[in-house]
Regions:
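Membrane-proximal intracellular helices of multi-pass ion channels
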Residues: 1-304
Length: 304
């Protein structure tokens, strides 16, 4: 693990001594990205519904109060929030279930795993808090960790890798939202073609120019991850950093560039990545994956 003076990030008891501090860190990671969704919903809500809610906000009617709350979050905000929440809950469930089953390789060595896969985890957190922290830190792209991701089970390690590759499960402050809007534009365009209507999103027509930019924006993220991963495993400078000769070695490389592209910062440690090649390649991926989508999305906004 990387980070902080001791190099243990949120696993060190000096920074994160109890479950309470762990929960505070989790909440701190989630509040800004979720707030961005609420702000978007507020900005995109129906003016007519807002007017009705404002006229009834001072009454004692529960129905009117509920209506005001719905308008405050906005229909678009609710839809995006629910979609992201479903992906988050599924990932959390899979990670916790896989980690609670334990590591079969450790079990075959004769070690009893009544607490689940505790390799690389802090005893004070256990499997539950570690799985939650792992899911949150890779969903909200903060990069902080309270356990060793490299020691996760195969399915447990798939969840953070998937969340960073999708980069739409809440994401960083505004990043997950802007990527989800690209998926929304593509979905609206496809649905419009299926029913024979001109695609529109938030009252704006979606045409060929916007779709080309949206498709380019979607392709950038996997292209950078897979392209640089292929480069790393094809040249000596990259191969020399892989310490696991099996499939997990390839997973370490994919995770490294997925984490860089998602601006996360966590990693499957064991990869000898403090070299010129890894530092330069990860820096390039980090720069391109962050600014190219922003530039393209500004282009989409300007053409609508």
């Amino acid at each position: 693990m990387v980070g902080d003076f001791l190099g243990a990030n949120s696993a060190t008891p000096l920074e994160n001594p109890t479950i309470i501090t762990n929960i505070i860190e989790l909440f701190s990671m989630m509040i800004l990205p979720v707030s961005c969704i609420f702000v978007f919903g507020r900005m995109a809500y129906d003016k007519y519904e807002e007017s009705k809610a404002n006229n009834s906000v001072y009454t004692l009617s529960t129905k009117n109060c509920n209506r005001a709350n719905k308008v405050w979050m906005g229909k678009e905000g609710r839809t995006i929030f629910v979609a992201m929440s479903i992906l988050f809950v599924i990932g959390l469930g899979v990670c916790f279930w896989s980690e609670s089953l334990g590591n079969h390789a450790v079990a075959q060595a004769g070690v009893t795993e009544t607490l689940g896969n505790m390799e690389g985890k802090e005893v004070r957190f256990g499997v539950a808090q570690s799985a939650l922290f792992t899911t949150v830190t890779t969903s909200f792209t903060t990069g902080t960790v309270n356990n060793m991701h490299d020691t996760l089970t195969p399915l447990g390690g798939l969840v953070p890798l998937m969340h960073m590759m999708l980069n739409v499960v809440f994401g960083g402050a505004g990043v997950g939202l802007m990527n989800m809007l690209i998926y929304a534009i593509i979905a609206v365009f496809i649905c419009g073609l299926m029913i024979g209507r001109t695609p529109e999103y938030l009252g704006k027509k979606i045409e060929g120019k916007e779709m080309k930019l949206a498709a380019l924006c979607i392709i950038i993220h996997p292209l950078l991850i897979l392209g640089f991963s292929a480069l790393a495993v094809s040249i000596p400078e990259g191969v020399n950093g892989i310490t696991n000769p099996g499939f997990h070695g390839l997973s370490q490389v994919l995770y490294e560039f997925a984490s860089s592209a998602a601006n996360n910062g966590s990693g499957f440690e064991g990869l000898v990545d403090n070299t010129l090649f890894w530092n330069m390649s990860c820096g390039i991926v980090m720069f391109l994956a962050r600014y190219l989508p922003i530039i393209i999305q500004l282009g989409i906004a300007g053409s609508l």
